[in-house]
Amino acid sequence: MTNIRKSHPLFKIINDSLIDLPAPSSISSWWNFGSLLGICLAIQILTGLFLAMHYTSDTTTAFQSVTHICRDVNYGWILRYLHANGASMFFICLFLHVGRGLYYGSYIYKETWNVGVILLFAVMATAFMGYVLPWGQMSFWGATVITNLLSAIPYIGTNLVEWIWGGFSVDKATLTRFFAFHFLLPFIISALVMVHLLFLHETGSNNPTGIPSDSDMIPFHPYYTIKDMLGALAMILVLMTLVLFSPDLLGDPDNYIPANPLNTPPHIKPEWYFLFAYAILRSIPNKLGGVLALVLSILILIVMPLLHTSKQRSMMFRPLSQCLFWLLVADLLTLTWIGGQPVEHPFIIIGQLASILYFLLILVLMPITSIVENHLLKW
């Protein structure tokens, strides 16, 4: 008799995706982040569900309801901080996952890559709306500043912003709809994850060498299930350390002040994981130009397959490209730092130079370096 996991219609899908899936034998720990992102998503949905049971999306009671969760609900404080810091872990894993894709040329699988970029946008939208919900000072002013950027769109901008706000300013209608969308989007993300995996399993995983590994595959279980469990353990250890020892390390103290439309905080800034894009936005003196640069800073990932000029897929054997890749990482860290600084000298000029370098590296220097490496290999 055939094993039930190979014959049952539902178990067969799970078996082909998680148990008998052929995987390259050489994939390193950089391939762990897909499963870690899945765990992050599960943590966020579960903690978010329980938080939603106690949260009220009304401007008069939202801030109090979050305080009530932390003080009066059994283990409410741990739910709240798991959710807040879980978002940070989510983005750390996301950035490392995308970075791995760039380094090892995973973007050659266009369908998987494009769904991944859509996922990145969806997660960023979800995180932004979630940051508005506690209705602190930074929530309110962050929502005001970021939604107001849409007014830079010619002709329809102002109408679009008022339509999103549900009025003439960020108010009760805005908070209610942001809560509704913040609850809905993770389930859309879950569906997109399925599509992402569907496309990935059409081609199979890439590997560090970038060379097809069809002749050297091993079953996903037990080798990579054990490996993923180790990665999950490490991530949960970091997350719990953050939650239990310094839960507010990555947050903004201003968000412990209830939202006040009459009092603007001295430095309006988003959560740390948006700072690099915020720095690019601020470095351009023109509003529409800034908004375009902000969107393009992430949308640029879509054109990565077109910018691939190397004859090798991975950067593993391309030392010049490796140098530029790590320069890009350093540049993104610089932008993240600048995004959290006030708009004054010398931070303005550093931000502008870092923004120019970011686009220059991706659009010009990396493709040219790949062509140079192709010629060097001929010798």
From Swiss-Prot:
Please give the start and end residues of each transmembrane region: 33-53, 77-98, 113-133, 178-198, 226-246, 288-308, 320-340, 347-367
- Which residues make up the binding site for a ubiquinone? H201
InterPro entries named among the record's database cross-references: Cyt_b/b6_C (IPR005798), Cyt_b/b6_C_sf (IPR036150), Cyt_b/b6_N (IPR005797), Cytb/b6-like_sf (IPR027387), Cytochrome_b (IPR030689), Cytochrome_b_C_euk/bac (IPR048260), Cytochrome_b_N_euk/bac (IPR048259), Di-haem_cyt_TM (IPR016174)
The membrane topology term of the UniProt record is:
Multi-pass membrane protein
Gene3D superfamilies (UniProt xref): Cytochrome Bc1 Complex, Chain C
A Pfam family that the UniProt record links to this protein: Cytochrome_B
Name the Gene Ontology biological process terms: mitochondrial electron transport, ubiquinol to cytochrome c
Q: How is the cofactor bound?
A: Binds 2 heme b groups non-covalently.
Name the principal localization, coarsely classed.
mitochondrion
Q: Give GO cellular component annotations, separated by semicolons.
A: mitochondrial inner membrane; respiratory chain complex III
**Residues involved in heme b b566 binding:** H97, H196
Additional information: Heme 1 (or BL or b562) is low-potential and absorbs at about 562 nm, and heme 2 (or BH or b566) is high-potential and absorbs at about 566 nm.
Functionally, this protein is described as follows: Component of the ubiquinol-cytochrome c reductase complex (complex III or cytochrome b-c1 complex) that is part of the mitochondrial respiratory chain. The b-c1 complex mediates electron transfer from ubiquinol to cytochrome c. Contributes to the generation of a proton gradient across the mitochondrial membrane that is then used for ATP synthesis.
Assembly mode: The cytochrome bc1 complex contains 11 subunits: 3 respiratory subunits (MT-CYB, CYC1 and UQCRFS1), 2 core proteins (UQCRC1 and UQCRC2) and 6 low-molecular weight proteins (UQCRH/QCR6, UQCRB/QCR7, UQCRQ/QCR8, UQCR10/QCR9, UQCR11/QCR10 and a cleavage product of UQCRFS1). This cytochrome bc1 complex then forms a dimer.
Query: What is the protein's given name?
Result: Cytochrome b
Organism lineage reads as: Eukaryota, Metazoa, Chordata, Craniata, Vertebrata
